[in-house]
Amino acid sequence: MSLPVAVSATLSKGDLEAVNRIAIKQLRLTHRSSLLEQHALQLSQLLFQIVNEAGMNTPELACEAAYKLGFPAAKVIQTVRENSASDHDVIGRLLSPACYIDQSFPAVLYFAARYHDDFESALLANTKVGGDNCHRGAVLGSILGASLGVDAIPKRWITGLTAYAELDKEIEAFVALYAERLSF
């Protein structure tokens, strides 16, 4: 879900409602769930704010989104730091590592807030807690990628891909297509 929302957040500058419509339209291609829609709208708003509003505080935004979904991420992060606790104390005890949206998306927001300035540490921490880490990682990567920019992604993660040259061409073509649309 995150790539179309991120792209629409960029293309729909200043129009959160348009971004939300795109997010819900995409979600409804495969799911009809008010719970999923609630979470999709939080992601949509978060990405929109990161992409369109200068100086946004990603940890604060992520904690706010988590709070709206019923998870006190700011308080949990504070407790984890005070007690030198592990991410396993959060994902596995407070939140399930499974794919259920009411557990997995707050987990993503927890990681986005806790590791807001370190893309690599965030993705590694997510991976280490196990469970549905691939899907969480995709969304976490989109949040931190939007916040920190492409330079925050370790170069070895990009150039070390088996089909790096082919993927690089596809990405450049994709970006060029949307750059053309933005230029008129």
Residue ranges and their predicted role:
Residues 146-184:
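Conserved glycine-rich phosphate/nucleotide-binding loop
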Residues 134:
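Conserved catalytic/binding loops enriched for acidic/polar residues
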Residues 1-115, 123-129, 143:
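Amphipathic alpha-helical interface segments
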Residues 6, 137-148:
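Short, small-residue alpha-helix embedded
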Residues 12-18, 117-122, 149-161:
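Phosphate-handling active-site elements
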Residues 106, 110, 120-124, 137-138, ...:
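A generic structural signal for well-ordered alpha-helical surface patches
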